Every structure is written in structure tokens, then in C-alpha cells.
Amino acid sequence: MGLSWKERVFMALLGVAAASGLTMLVLILVKAINVLLPADTKFGIVFDAGSSHTSLFVYQWPANKEKDTGVVSQALTCQIEGPGISSYTSDPTQAGESLKSCLEEALALIPQAQHPETPTFLGSTAGMRLLSQKNSSQARDILAAVSQTLSKSPVDFWGAKILAGQDEGAFGWITINYVLGMLLKYSSGQWILPEEGMLVGALDLGGASTQISFVPQGPILDQSTQVTFRLYGANYSVYTHSYLCFGRDQILNRLLAKLAQDRLSSQVAPVRHPCYHSGYQAILPLSSLYDSPCIHTTDSLNHTQNLTVEGTGDPGNCVVALRSLFNFSSCKGQKDCAFNGIYQPPVHGQFYAFSNFYYTFHFLNLTSRQSLNTVNDTVWKFCQKPWKLVEVSYPGQERWLRDYCASGLYILVLLLEGYKFSEETWPNIQFQKQAGDTDIGWTLGFMLNLTGMIPAEAPTHWRAQSYSIWTAGVVFAVLTLVAILGAAAIQIFWTQD
């Protein structure tokens, strides 16, 4: 006796279910391939404790690194309220307390589970270098206070230290070249090392020091000015030097102190300041000038007296006064020498000028790569404006307003006569605050170097299918389910009959 139509349908559905189910298993098990899951994101925190203020930066990078160095990007920046940590000599604990608000903001961004593995570092620069020279005990107390605050936070605290000027310059060089894609760039779906080309030099003007860093055309003859790096599998040799006491704030204080000493010797009162606008007048405490080891005093000078200063708005004499703060004669006749007897190869390639280089020229609207003649003309004309006109023209900017003339002329003296840029090489300088969305400074370069010391995590392997195989598997799974449900329905109706 043959099978009934119900039996034939039932058997057919079971056959379809078995065939499609077997096909689905083959697709899942046999056609699967090994794939890498996206790497976990790691975070790092760096405090830049400068002479005038402190900033916090949060960086992030994939856990699996490219050629032993993390592919780092900036995730957060936070400027801490108050002065630089070197100002807290009378109450060092406040230096640590000042960091808390920005640290809390950083921890809110980073997943809580990753707080204990987030490397955190505080680097102090020229302000603390000067304090260490003046009073090493006070400098140690401040570093101890900030270390205590950060070590109590839930992060992996790597330490707080005074950064050497050479490191500050070299890490700034790394930052610029990394952000501009000179060290590593993304192309055709992967990170690759770019061909050897035009690496960019770094010009940094802080409050207490200035740094120049670049790769010269020839060999670096003075090994004390050479720093070597290995980043993303490539080696780099960079010339770098830091000039302490030649930062913006210190040079302006040194200039005022020199004018005050000259006034004392000539018995002329008040001090006539050629870099201040005509009509400007102020009474300044003389003692504040001599807090820094950058300024050498004379026994005959009474530090308790006040100083009356009058501006004359004379850019020519301002340049003469600024030049007197350099020792150019020590490099006379030497091709590879900047000033103060310091070795420097001839500048080569493109340069990014940042920090106070940028802030000063941004105020003067000189960041659009104007010619040297235009820059000179603009700065001189600004210096010759009467103080009352300057005040009216720039409301709400009183804090730094009197100093932009001196700062602009100082930058020209430093770059042209100090670092030996010329009218031909001037167009190679770009005045920038950021490259892309990243602030230019030493902190990113430090974090890139630091990630070379942080162990990489092995990428996680999973079994997966291509999209077409996955789609086919879903179709056969649905077909199997429909066949089984159909067979079950037939069985139920069959039993009822």
C-alpha cells in the first residue's frame, strides 16, 4: 500500500528541514573565517604645567599598536584655573588642589573600568626649572604636593617631574610631525609610514623659555644638541635646544629690569620704556622683577621701591634694547652658531611656530604667511600708536595689551638674528595654534613616546562569515524552521484525523 498524501508531504518537509539545516551548519562551520575584533581604546592623561598656567590633555589610542607605537589622538583638553604650579611656593598643597577640577572632567570621559590602567603624568617646564634653580626645596615641595593629589586618584600615576628643555623641544617636534602625517598616515584602509620627505621643524615660545627643533640638512656636530627617537619602526635624529630665560614673560621682565638699572645709573626718573606705547604710564613694584634667577641685581638697587614707567612708543630703540639681552658677539663669524655661543646648524625646511609665537602674531593679524616686509611694517606701526588709541581699539584685552609691541619685536629679533632665518626662509614659517584638531605642544609627543613603553594587547580573534555567507545562512535557517513547523502542523492534523 502506497503512502498517503499526508505522509508524502510530511516526509518531504522533513527532508527539506534536514537538507537546509545541514547546509546551514556547513556554511556556519566550514565557511567561517578568522577575523579581528576592533581593538579596545586606551587612554592617557598628561598635565602640561607651564610657567603661567597648567593644561590637562586626554589622549586615546587603539590597544593593539602600529609598529610598537600607539596611533594617538586628542580626546579632551582642559585649562586649569589659576597660575602655573611654580607660583604656589607659599602653599604647595594648593598646587595639587588646583588640578582636581580638570582631572574630574577627564575621568568622566574615560570609562570607569579603565581608570586604574590609564597612565597619568605631570610634566612641568621652564617655570619650575627656574624655581628649582632659585629654591630647589620649594620646587620639591610643589612636585610632592601634585604627586600626592594624583597618586590618590584612581588612575595609574606615572609621576610628576621637571621636564628638561631638550625633551620639551623634541616632544614638540614629534607632535607637529605626527599630526601632519609626516611620521604615520592613513592610506588605502591602513596605517603606513610615509616616504622620507620634508619633516617640519618646531619653534616654541613659552613664558620662561624658547625651543627650536628640526632635522638639519647635514650631520649634527654637537651631540649634546641631538635627540634620537624610534617611532613606528623608523629612527629620527633631531637637533634641539632650549634657551632658558628667553621665554616671552622672562624676556619682558629682563628688559624692564635692564631699563630700570640704566635709569638708576643715569639718575633719570621715571623709566622711559621704548617698547610701551606713548602715553602709557604705570607704577610697578621693583621687587617683582627680581623674583626670577633670570634677572641679576646690583647691590645698589633698592628692591622695595616702586618703579614709574612711561612708554615712548619707539620701535627702533625697542629693538636696540632687546638686542642687548642677547650675546650675538659670541657667534661672530661662525656659520653654525645662533647666539650666546650655542651651536645650531642652518635652519632647514618648513617650521611651525606655536605658543606665544602664535598668540602674539594672531593678535597682530599676522598668521596668514605675510611677507617679512609686511610683518615688520605692521609691528612697527602698532608700536607707534598712542596708548589711548590702543586701549580704545582693543577693549577687554588690557592684561597683555601693553606687551604686544615688545613681544612682536622680540619675535622678529629672535627669529631673524637669533635663529638666523632670513627674508628667503621667512615664508617657511607658519604661525599655528593647532594642526588639525590637535593642540601643538610637547604633550602629544610625550604620549606617543610613552605608548612605546606601554605593552600592546594582542588583538582578539573570532570566527565569522562574510556578509553573503551570513545572509545565505539566515535564509537556510528560516527554511529549516518553516519546514519543521510545516511537518509539525501536518503531524497534528494527522493525529486529529
From Swiss-Prot:
Q: Which cysteines are joined by disulfide bonds?
A: 78-102, 245-294, 331-337, 383-405
> What the entry says about post-translational processing?
N-glycosylated.
Per the entry, which co-factors are needed? Ca(2+); Mg(2+)
Cofactor note (record): Ca(2+) or Mg(2+). Has lower efficiency with Mg(2+).
**Segments passing through the bilayer:** 9-29, 474-494
Residues annotated as glycosylated are 306, 365
Q: In which tissues is it expressed?
A: Expressed in liver, jejunum and kidney.
Q: Where in the cell is it found?
A: Cell membrane
Q: Where is the catalytic site?
A: 168
Cite the ranges annotated as topological domain Cytoplasmic. 1-8, 495-497
**Chemical reaction(s) catalysed:** a ribonucleoside 5'-triphosphate + 2 H2O = a ribonucleoside 5'-phosphate + 2 phosphate + 2 H(+)
Q: Which GO terms describe its biological process?
A: nucleoside diphosphate biosynthetic process; nucleoside monophosphate biosynthetic process
The record, for Pfam families, names:
GDA1_CD39
UniProt-recorded Gene Ontology molecular function terms:
apyrase activity; ATP binding; metal ion binding; nucleoside diphosphate phosphatase activity; ribonucleoside triphosphate phosphatase activity
Topological domains on the Extracellular side lie at: 30-473
- Class of enzymatic activity (EC top level): hydrolase
| Superkingdom of this protein's organism | Eukaryota
Give the UniProt keywords, A-Z. Answer: ATP-binding, Calcium, Cell membrane, Disulfide bond, Glycoprotein, Hydrolase, Magnesium, Membrane, Metal-binding, Nucleotide-binding, Transmembrane, Transmembrane helix
EC number of this enzyme: 3.6.1.5
Q: What is known of its domains?
A: The transmembranous domains are involved in regulation of enzyme activity.
- Please describe what this protein does: Canalicular ectonucleoside NTPDase responsible for the main hepatic NTPDase activity. Ectonucleoside NTPDases catalyze the hydrolysis of gamma- and beta-phosphate residues of nucleotides, playing a central role in concentration of extracellular nucleotides. Has activity toward ATP, ADP, UTP and UDP, but not toward AMP.
Protein family according to the UniProt entry? Belongs to the GDA1/CD39 NTPase family.
Q: Report the protein name in the record.
A: Ectonucleoside triphosphate diphosphohydrolase 8
Source species, please? Mus musculus (Mouse)
